[in-house]
């Protein structure tokens, strides 16, 4: 049943590999992963260069500060969420990157490279084994690394499916405006 606001939760079981082999749509750098109830996204698991674990925590603080100083610093990426984890497997540390966003995979990764190249910043990915050293000028190599380390999900769920981050922000602004209007009427 449709709830208030016109949304209905949705789940999508994903085929092994992340997309239907009979419905492959090619992007600039390979198959386009489908939009799901959780929008677009990807998960990367890659081994970090030994001894670099502190760099990841410092980098997280840098992202926190950058967003606090300039809230729209990552806006071009159309992100909903990012989640980063470090974990050990047989004594080696791995990095897991999980991102949910509103653009397709190719656009997201191209935009990410452009943000870093324009700002002069480095990416925490430079601390991953096998990450291309020329990534700032070689978007295809960056994207190949991401695709090679992507671990497709096999289930995605959305409480408010297929809704963009911009739509959510607009709905929250509208709610605040209505609340303010009702307060003014009292």
Per-region residue spans from a language model:
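Conserved His + Asp/Glu catalytic blocks
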Residues: 117-131
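Short S/T/G/P-rich N-terminal loop/turn motif that feeds into the first structured element of a domain
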Residues: 1-94, 100-116, 131-186
